[in-house]
Amino acid sequence: SMRPKEIRELGDPELDQKEKDLREETFRLRLRMAAGQTENKMAGRAARRDLARVLTIKAERKASSEG
């Protein structure tokens, strides 16, 4: 799980890549959970939270660049 400070230190291209990776990871984890193949529900939660952090920071940057 990444800290917001670590995410803020990433550049925009890295942030976009991180978002893509986390979306893929959450999708794969969701499929595995649906198939009953994973017992690690915390991994899914951590991935979703990291994705939320990335999206929040992207939104902050967009808002600050517009205003």
Features from the language model and the residues they span:
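Extended, charge-rich alpha-helical interface modules
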Residues: 1-67
